[in-house]
């Protein structure tokens, strides 16, 4: 079976069309942290078969796999097809092609939740204190609650 590919531009459109999509990065965890698409979920190829079902329980779900353009995503697509997933595509050229098309690559892990927290802080002006202020509050036995 030939692996379907999607261009970076097509993937960008898929991510914004409102339909269900699972964007899975099949590189190993360290590689994922070095740079990935914003809403990609890490699913290392080494854990593919043991971890796919909790992430994508419906075998007809639309799945796009990304990698470093080194063929790992194609191997993962073939394996997913073999175990019954029917709508699997690969990002043509991997993350490098995504970046070359002018789209952002994000470093680190849990980026969407960190981004959300920063947006909430910016928009709603959530209160924050410095380490020095916290030490002074503790020294004065002030009653406080810290939410991190």
Residues covered by each model-derived region:
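Rhodanese-like catalytic fold shared by cysteine-dependent sulfurtransferases
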Residues: 1-22, 26-145
């Amino acid at each position: 079976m030939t692996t379907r590919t999607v261009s970076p531009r097509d993937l960008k459109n898929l991510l914004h069309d409102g339909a269900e999509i699972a964007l899975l990065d099949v590189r190993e965890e360290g590689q994922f942290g070095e740079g990935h698409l914003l809403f990609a979920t890490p699913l290392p190829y080494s854990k593919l078969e043991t971890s796919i079902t909790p992430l994508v329980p419906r075998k007809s779900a639309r799945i796009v796999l990304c990698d470093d353009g080194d063929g790992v995503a194609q191997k993962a697509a073939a394996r997913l097809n073999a175990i019954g997933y029917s709508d699997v595509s690969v990002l043509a050229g991997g993350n490098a092609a995504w970046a070359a098309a002018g789209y952002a690559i994000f470093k680190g892990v849990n980026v969407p939740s960190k981004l959300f927290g920063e947006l909430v802080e910016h928009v709603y002006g959530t209160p924050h204190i410095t380490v020095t202020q916290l030490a002074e509050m503790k020294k004065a036995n002030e009653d406080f609650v810290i939410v991190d």
